[in-house]
Amino acid sequence: MDSTSFLPTFLDVDLTISHIKCLPKDILVKFQGIKSNECEFDYHVLQREIQHTPKVKNNVEIDEFCLVEERVSGEWQRGRVMEKKNELYTVLLIDRGEELRVAGPQIASACGNLFELPPRVVFGIFANILPVGEKWSPKALNYFKSLVGIQVKGYVQAILPLQMFLFEVPKIISQALELQLGRLVDGDSFRLIVEMLEEFPQQMPDLLQHKRPELSLGNKDTSLDIQHVLDKLQPSLSVGSTESVKVSSALSPSKFYCQLIKWTPELENLTAHMTLHYDTVCQETSPTCDNFGLLCVARRRNGQWHRGILQQLLPPNQVKIWFMDYGSSEAIPSIYVKKLKQDFILVPLFSFPCSLTCLHSPDRDARIFQLSIFKQALLGQVVYAHIDWFNKDECLYYVTLQTQESTVNSKCLLKTVGTQVLCPMSDSKISNILSETSVSDVNSFAVESFMGNIEWSIDSLNKKGILKVGFPIKTVQMEIEAAYIAFIAYVLNPSNFWVRTNDHRNEFQEIMKNINKFYDLCENDEMILRKPEPGLFCCARYSKDRRFYRAVITEINGYKINVYFLDYGNTDSIPFFDVKILLPEFCELPALAMCCSLAHIFPVEDLWTKAAIDYFKKLVLNKAILLQVIAKKDDKYTVNIQSVEASENIDVISLMLQAGYAEYFQVELEYFPKSVSEYSMLNSESKNKVNIKKVISALLEGPKSKKYHSNNLVENNLSLPKSLAVNISEFKNPFTLSVGPESSWPYKEYIFRPGTVLEVKCSCYYGPGDFSCQLQCKSEDLKLLMEQIQNYYSIHSDPYEIGQTACVAKYSGKWCRAAVLTQVSKEVDIVFVDYGYQKRVLIEDLCAINPRFLLLESQAFRCCLNHFIEPVSCKLFSWTRKAFRDLWNFISSSRGLLTCIIYALVIIHPNHLYNLVDLQSSFTSAKEFLMNRGSAQYITLSETFPSLFSLYSYCYSSFNIQIGSEEEVYISHIYSPQKFYCQLGRNNKDLEMIETKITESVNLQNFPKYDSNKMRVCISKYVEDGLSYRALAIPTDSSSEFQVYFVDFGNKQLVGENMLRAISAQFPELLFTPMQAIKCFLSDLRDVDIPAEISSWFKDNFLGRSLKAIILSQESDGQLGIELYDGSQYINEKIKVLLHAYGKRHCDQACCMEKSNKINENKRFTTSLKGKTGNNYRHNVINKPSPVTYSERKIDQLMHPKNIHARFLKPSVCYKMEPVSKNKMKTSLNDGLKGIKIVPGAAHILENRRVGQKSVKVVSQSFIRALNQTTSQNPYDLIRPQIKDLPQPQIYLNAKVKGYVSNISNPANFHIQLAENESVIIRLADALNATARRLRERKSVKPLVGDLVVAEYSGDNAIYRAVIKKILPGNSFEVEFIDYGNSAIVNTSKIYELQREFLTVPQLGIHAFLSGVKWNEPDEIWDDKTVDYFTSKVHNKTVYCEFLKKHDQKWEVNMICDEKCVINELLKWKACSKLQKSALQMPQVLSQKVRPGDNEMKKGKSNESEGSMNSNQQLFKIPLEEFKLGQLEKAEMLNVSKSGRFYVKLSKNKKILSDLIVLITKEEKKSPFLSMESIEKGLECLAKSKNTLKWHRSKVEEKYVDDKVLVFLVDCGIYEIVPVCNTKLLSNEIRNIPRQAVPCKWIWFENSKNISFECLFADLEINILFLKYLDAVWEVEILVDDLLLLEYLNLNTVPVEENKLRLAEIVYNIESKTPVSSCTIKSFTWVQFQNDRQYSGIATAVSDPSDFSIQLEDFFDIMKYLFMLLSDLPETLQTLPQEFIIPGSSCLFKYKSEDQWNRVEISEVSPQSLCLVLVDYGFSFYIRYSEIINLKVVPEELLNLPRLSYPCILYGILPAKGKHWSEEAKIFFRDFLSKPDLVFQFREYHSETKLKVDVIHEKNNLADILVASGLATYSKDSPHLDAITATESAKNPI
């Protein structure tokens, strides 16, 4: 049956979305939905009919309908065949949306009557929506996936083959556009895209013509009139030309519409004017389009108005409009259709119809190629169109499309930019038309609305007043201590504004009149500046008033040019055709705008607020002012302003201060001239006022002098009123105020801002509700203070006076600082302020504190756990005994390393300030720990604090923001790009709730009064809008004024007390909802000096906007470092571009560059590069964590320098002239250049800062060629670039990147090339070698060490970038090729200058070393074997590098090759002992300090004679294991003495201990015996134990006369007397491994001598808490089962059965294990089995004696518990991240046929499949790679349960023949393991490898049976073999 046999009869459809298929690179979003209006009963009846209808088993082909039988239920369903392989069919169930795979007998032919009812499930594509870029963003993917389950309304545009609907949903489209997730595409173009992307079995049918009521409106005459008008407006394009275009609409490849890219700004301009006009008049009545075909204007879905032609009326109240500037049609509501004004009709069309020329070509390949480019253009890519010919009859341009990568387009692009815009009418005419379209005040409103133009200031003028452009233009100057009549030309803020003095007023008016008179007569394509470059003088049309002004070009930005208006000071970004050549007669007048700053004031905030700027503008704009010049720095004047027109002497500075918009600061003497120190502010209250009228009259009546020396201004020593000199120090941090009266508490205290993250240790603990912490960073300060206190009070006894708060008292025998709390008779209660302990002592035991001991803050700050959790079954802040113990265990187990996050400040009665905190260890947090233990639960906001508690601050929340996550944010307040506040988009509901509750609170009749003495949190009115917001109030010096901080927005304000309200207890939400303002900074701009102009631009453009933020870092104060994106605009990068234009960063670089006389263009090139590669950069950052590399397009520009963009890349070049000694001068130099040397430098290095240096000269662009020529003639004096001058490659930490190792010296010195830079490297080499011949014609260079050059590589005679490493004899140099890493010796004749354009490419060979290797060791320590092994692992292979940290110039990397960690492979390599000894940083060795001689060990020392070894010849002793106080370790008792000292070995060191045994075994075979003479006390040696008969590392304790010595076995913890003949020399090879026996002493041993505990723990694993190191022994606490030893002994009075693993020992240990980390991979826990112990169990997965798994009976209880946990898991678990799809990762997996989750571990990964191991059963299986979405993250509780199956190998035997087991042996082995009552005896245990076991059944050993049967043989290390050998020896004595 044909798939199109039934078509629904509906157009408008209601659907419930059931499934979404949306992939990042699949631009079509597909869905499944169920129609809401379907009748369930009809489908129920149909299903019954299907079951009873006879089935015809004919052959069914692909895409045909059929009936299919389900295997499980046996029911037949309707379906369609999707795939057929042999007799297996994949069938889509059309009524359920599922796919089924069945065999041929389960398929039947479709019966016609059964398929009359449409499919119940609708399959379709969301129409008319495409991604913004090349693929969908993660945010867009989440949005579409969120649509599942939502009911939507839309209409079907078309029905494709296979019943696929094109479904347009207006709601989804509008939301996607609003969230900037996608872009709108017209219906015709979208259908064409679908047709080209989707492969259908037949041609796609036309759009279904569902007939709606239509009304014919026009006649042929009207249509002809319109066509006549359109023909007149049609643009004329030259045949044979090539234009840059984008496709705006398309019906087919034979009919589509294009727009020229160069017309884009004009189209935007027209659209903006029309939108402005029609939005203004939209409310008014206007003529409707009442005749068919009339030209009209309509508002499209994006809110903009466009010109169109009315095509058709559609019900209900809609009109189909064809938009003439786009070529597409759209249905528009009739209310948004207006009559097109005559003014807008005359503007030419911006689209033109096209057809592909190739469609008529017989060349099939050409057609395919053109269609592929056409498809790219349809998807939004800009292409080039070559106009082949024009068909007048069809009115079509036939074109050939070309991509931007095409090599011919370097010429085409030149034709595009700089040529005239071929329109039938001039731009000036368009401008006049647009300017006349105002309705009332539309034009004035338009000027304010067009603020999208970027405005910033550049420092473009020379310090000597010469502008380096085509003509020497002098700049007006003002002199210090002079006064001028002036006018303000432009205001950015009071610190940055531009003035024009009255001196040149007439000349300026005259020249402006002539400029506009001349340029207004020019056509749009006339007088265009053909080759615009930064620094060129021009005449530019200002975009707001369309008038021309003198300007200078600051930056080229695509088709737009940024200019700075020299007579006004402002800037603009305008199209290139609005930049005209400036005639010489207009260059005679100097540049008039001078930058000024108002003296003595600065903003109340970090930035000037809009209100302050507006107030300043009101005072100074549009009026004459008296300008008093106080000082000058660079080109900026510091001035005072008084109004000329006011009746009184009005000082602007005083007015700004009195209005509260500014604050006062004193003059810095080094900034101003000396005479200025006598200056002060003009004050209206002063007795000696300046008579401004006299000053003005002198200025106006006297001769036209350039300045006026106002002696009165100097003599009048005026001062600022004291009331205005506000101390701002109190307002910097709202949380620095003390709680109580300052006089009552003499100690300084820490008061932290909520959100602060601190590294602390707990110093005092009274419970979760009261504990004290100390800052770790202050521990050394406290230690020093304590030493000083002990020294002082050991010889002084200052008497304490009653009534003093501060004192000192003894605690634990030491004097400590204390404070008196209360006095009771002769005793006082004190608190030790540095520790938090409280104690009652006698007054006579106190001493007075010396004032110098008060300088350090109180180190203990009081805390209680965050109020968002509360005790279980208790009141708030009341905790159970269990909670007390649990939190203490958490603190104790943290090993002293705790992170404290401040969430809020709270006052607890009577006046104690507490910090509400959460503590975090490296594994978990206290909150989670207590909740997991059942000691706490979440609190709701329905309750407030008890009456004894009150909030001192609002609450902080991290909002679960993760590093690397992406958030939608709204900027709520901006100080600068380095400090601003954001609100999260997902918190909108909370903000709305806060607003609602505040409104309700304000409307209360009896609201509580605000009491400033008791509270800080309040509701405050905001002055500018009169509304109330949550705030934090800080008192000021004024009793009635408060500084308030609006916690949900981030800004501050000074308000009166009457504007504050307390928060009522009825609204706890206002207290407990976290502060919504999140403090942020732009990540890579924090330490950059950002001018106020750029900060203002940032504020004007993005305040209140919805932006996308990527979180990169979090500072200790909670501030987030982020990257901001506005749609596709990368804001961080844009600000860097603005900084480049402003020049500030290069001024800062100038000092460093001059000091070193080196080029440092790093910053400039970086910003220039990033500005051009912004899209590439953003794409990488958003979609993948891989490093960003240099754009390949830049290499194209280097290879094709004629490309117009190549000159945009080159920064403006200036040259700095410096003296050169005479003996270096060459006579060939031109006379004008004698005695100078040429230093390429940044354009803004124009200051003379060094004493004795000649003034800097700036060379114009026209002189650069001569300079380059001079450089080649005299290369010896050139200061060349260094490696640091290259842009830094963008590398992201912890990101896995594909790459190749390009050069290897050793594991600590190699180079990496990133795979994504592969083509860049090749093309860079091509570009370099394209210039080779030209370079070789020049003279060779004589560089210095560190210079960047081009050098010829002898291997291929090609040239590459290189850096000089060494200067060698014979005119040779050692160079390193920086993009590859290898070095070579090159003669000076093969070394050339590196051209400037190649400095923009970062170093592509990344210098690296292997993580775990000492990066700064000399290369000589690496032997050839190690280097060869490392090379064999990575050479010519793809590696995955994880960049961890940069050390100097080397990157520390973790490298994966062949799915294995390279460093781990090196460690496993047995021949790498030297590597392990001196290069690899084993974790245990890391803690040891390097001793002298570590790297001086020589080979062959063991060859010395026996008696030559003396103890003083040993290079160093065996180190001790190092621990931190509070460190917790699992351990096993080794030996216990009666003195209480015992030795333990750490569980974590089992691998080290086993490796040590191997090393000792090898060592004793080659080491010589010691003689009695060579043995001394303290000598470390090898000794053979009489108990174990093995060799051990030992230390000699005593020598005895009978040739015996007492030795201490340092790895066993026991003493033995051994004969001298059992001692051997201990070499240095194994001396660096720390002692494995750790000496300990139980802290309660002295008090518990009656307890004999040595027998209890001889073989048990325990936890040791290291407390104090004293007398060469660690005092420790012992924990068993998370209980202190004393508690354990009290509870466990019944002996535990030793041969059984206890469930409690495992299950209750779960919570003490390390939780899963989001950044690391953790495997399931392995149980610690004891060797030689027997366990009962069963075998699970059995292959052969070398590969089988077992389960033990002891695990059966755990298995039940595990099964219960797995059964309770939800379906919606987090999917395992892509980066964890590697071998060793733990996860969960569920079979489709089962309902049970299984714990699995990834064993193997390939591109096609994954091998998973069921860790609880031992079986392994494969899944397809596409099923990784079914792998889920393991919850922490399940991760900590031990695995229940263990892989094993049968101990002591090998196959009888060969390396593999025979089939007979395998069958015998499997049969034996199938028997019941098996016993497994563990022989050797190695964590996470196979266990070696004996298998016993009824006392029969399986290994012996296999050997006896001839199926196996004993291995060399088999104990069975030893037993046989011993027996044979006994039978045959020698």
From Swiss-Prot:
Gene3D superfamilies: 2.30.30.140, 2.40.50.90. InterPro entries: SNase_OB-fold_sf, Tudor, Tudor_domain_containing, Tudor_TDRD15_rpt1, Tudor_TDRD15_rpt2, Tudor_TDRD15_rpt3, Tudor_TDRD15_rpt4, Tudor_TDRD15_rpt5. It holds the Pfam family TUDOR. It comes from the Eukaryota. Keywords: Repeat. Residues 1491-1504 have a biased composition (Basic and acidic residues). Residues 59-117, 289-347, 531-589, 799-856, 1011-1070, 1342-1401, 1574-1633, 1780-1838 form the Tudor domain. Residues 1490-1510 are annotated as: Disordered. This is Tudor domain-containing protein 15. It comes from Homo sapiens (Human).
